[in-house]
UniProtKB/Swiss-Prot annotation:
Protein name as it appears in the record: Phosphopentomutase
Organism: Shewanella sp. (strain W3-18-1)
Subcellular location field: Cytoplasm
Entry function: Isomerase that catalyzes the conversion of deoxy-ribose 1-phosphate (dRib-1-P) and ribose 1-phosphate (Rib-1-P) to deoxy-ribose 5-phosphate (dRib-5-P) and ribose 5-phosphate (Rib-5-P), respectively.
Entries under Gene3D superfamilies matching the protein: Alkaline Phosphatase, subunit A, Phosphopentomutase
Length: 404
């Protein structure tokens, strides 16, 4: 029985990529800087001491990062019995965003330029917002700027609740984000507004519209809920997910995967929120998955809760939780199963600003007859998609080189 389990540690980069200078990210290193902060006692909130990831280390994380950066991260070294194949991958796509990383990993790199709202204030064209408001029957909006999602709730959440005006904001990514209170504005109203916005953005080539629902009564307790929804464009070509589905296989999305691929190539969607819930749901799906199945999970908290919020201790604690549960996953794998752990970009919690960082991502592969050892530097995330196609004996993808 052949299956592939993909565990996407959203934003878990392993060092600045060769083209990082083009993105202002030279020196960024999500994994390395977290490990360094832990070793120096600077990440002892909710946890303490050096970063402890023994299971990821056995799968080759420390070695993959060493090959990427030229040095082992603090607390990681050669004194580990490797059980997995490991490498690091350069992104071929033009952006450092979520859709680009995910699509490329599935065999379809983004070779065009996304549209962006580059102005930090008055970010959105009036012509665009006028059309959105008219169609939605709204008399105004708040925000219209680059912002941290949590900070903008503190600044504008109460005014939003009083006025009923949605909060529009963006970032360095190709994204239009809309924050609204679940009770005072209504979740269905937020989703409808996002659907309208997605349609009106067609001429702008924006990658995603993101619904950012929140609850609470004031700045001290405003919090995003688990009802986030991404409205993505469809990938420009068939991904390996589409090809497996067309061949009669199953593709199970856990978390936000289905949204990222605009439901293309997905046969089942499982909703889950938070690291524990996502891990539980992944294990449950693997236990019940049959032959020719992909179970694909995005562990978004690493990015949204820790990377963007520049929370080093939180990121470290999340990684240690994830690592402690990996033996549960390994115990479920058959000899023909393929487990892949990777990321879609970096988001160094020690870096300036709040945006993603252009980094190599780890490629940790276990099972399917792979020998423990180095896979080297991969020239594209698409090598993962090509390897999955090879594993299932599907028609080869147009991009990528298999390591199977």
């Amino acid at each position: 029985m052949k299956r592939t389990i993909i565990m996407m540690l959203d934003s878990f980069g392993v060092g600045a990529s060769a083209d990082a200078a083009s993105f202002g990210d030279v020196g960024s290193d999500t994994f390395g800087h977290i490990a360094k902060a832990c070793a120096e006692g600077k990440a002892d909130i909710g946890r303490e001491g050096p970063l402890k990831l023994p299971n990821l280390a056995r799968l080759g994380l420390g070695h993959a990062a060493m090959e990427s950066t030229g040095a082992f991260a603090p607390g990681f070294g050669d004194n580990v019995e490797l059980i997995g194949a490991y490498g690091h991958a350069q992104e071929l796509s033009s952006g450092k965003d979520t859709p680009s990383g995910h699509w490329e990993m599935a065999g379809v790199p983004v070779l065009f330029e996304w549209g962006y709202f580059s102005e930090h204030q008055n970010s959105f064209p009036k012509e665009l917002t006028d059309k959105i408001l008219a169609r939605a029957g709204l008399d105004g909006f708040l925000g219209n700027c680059h912002a941290s999602g949590t900070t903008i709730l503190e600044e504008l959440g109460e005014e939003h609740m009083r006025s009923g005006k949605p909060i529009f904001y963006t970032s360095a990514d190709s994204v239009f984000q809309i924050a609204c209170h679940e009770e005072t504005f209504g979740l269905d109203n937020l989703y409808r507004l996002c659907e309208i916005t997605r349609e009106e953005l067609a001429p702008y080539n924006i990658g995603r519209v993101i619904a950012r629902p929140f609850n609470g009564t004031g700045p001290s307790d405003f919090a995003r809920t688990g009802n986030r929804k991404d409205y993505s464009l469809e990938p420009p070509a068939k991904t390996v997910l589409d090809k497996l589905k067309a061949a009669g296989g199953e593709v199970v999305s856990v978390g936000k995967i289905a949204d990222i691929y605009a439901y293309c190539g997905i046969t089942k969607k499982v909703k889950a929120n938070g690291l524990e819930d996502l891990f539980d749901a992944t294990l449950a799906e693997v236990k019940s998955a049959g032959d020719n199945t992909i179970v694909f999970t995005n562990f978004v908290d690493f990015d949204s809760h820790y990377g963007h919020r520049r929370d080093v201790a939180g990121y470290a604690k999340g990684l240690e939780y994830f690592d402690a549960r990996l033996p549960e996953m390994l115990a479920l794998l058959g000899e023909d199963d393929l487990l892949i752990l990777t990321a879609d970009h970096g988001c160094d919690p020690t870096w300036q600003g709040t945006d993603h960082t252009r980094e190599y991502v780890p490629v940790l592969a276990y099972g399917a007859g792979l020998k423990a050892g180095s896979l080297g530097r991969r020239n594209s995330f698409a090598d993962i998609g090509q390897s999955i196609a090879s594993h299932f004996k599907l028609e080869p993808m147009a991009y990528g080189e298999s390591f199977i």
